[in-house]
Structure formats: C-alpha cells, structure tokens
Amino acid sequence: MILETKKMSLQNLTIKSQEILQQAQQLAFTSGNANIETEHVLKTMLNDKDSPIEYLLKKNNVNVNYVDEKLEAAIQKLPKVSSGEPAQALSRDANNILLRATASLKTFKDEFVSVEHLLIAILQGSDNTAKLLKDAGLTEKGLVAAITDLKKGST
C-alpha cells in the first residue's frame, strides 16, 4: 500500500479498514483524483458487502442508495490530475478521519480502528461527506447506538 498518513500507523487499523483504504486509493486512482478523499473512503465502505456500514446506515433510516448516488456524483466533481500519478496520499480531510477514528477507540474500548470507527470519524467531520451523511439523517448518537447493538450481536 502506498498510502501516506501523518501521525498514525496503519498497523492500528483492522485488516478490513486497511482493505477499505486500499480500495479507496484504487477508486481515487481510477477516477483520476489527486488525493484520496473522504468521498472515496465512504464509497468503498458502502460498496464492500462484508462491511457493516450499510446495516448501520439502514438501522438509522438512512437511504443508502441516495448516499451512494450523491457520493458517485461528488467523486466525479473532484479535481482530476492532468499529469503524473494520481491518488498517492490521503487528503487532509481523509487523514483527519484516521485521527478522529483513533480517538474514538476509547468510546468502544477497542484496540484497533474498524470501519465503524471510520464511519463515526467521517460523520464527525465538517466536509461535504459529513454533511451528506447528516443531511441523510445520520446522527452520531444514532450511529453509536447502532454500533453498540451490532457489537452486542443484536440486529
């Protein structure tokens, strides 16, 4: 993985979270984008059928198709690289996701950053991806409750 991040080791991530970031990098690369953005991360989390993200969003009455379509449109509008190789590093907003996700480990008494932590961190942001989730009806309180239920094994 070529990903660069500041102030955090990628070894603090679960294997699934590492895979998501690799897929986000690939999506950014194939889209011709300069950096890996929060839109790429959320889009790959939504598209990963082994990820609990779709369940967590639906548990909070979020229209997953709406979010997915808006993400696709947002990715198409991201700046394209005209020369050189695109998508080698996380954008500032995407790097901040990792920092916030690490901070949320204490809330759930976890050791590694999972995709659930990444979703909370995206929601806590102030960028367009966070706004999209909030506009779709996702709240941090509702998300934490759904994650807690998921960890208990109730659906």
Model regions and ranges:
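Histone-fold recognition with a strong bias for associated Lys/Arg-rich disordered tails
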Residues: 1-155
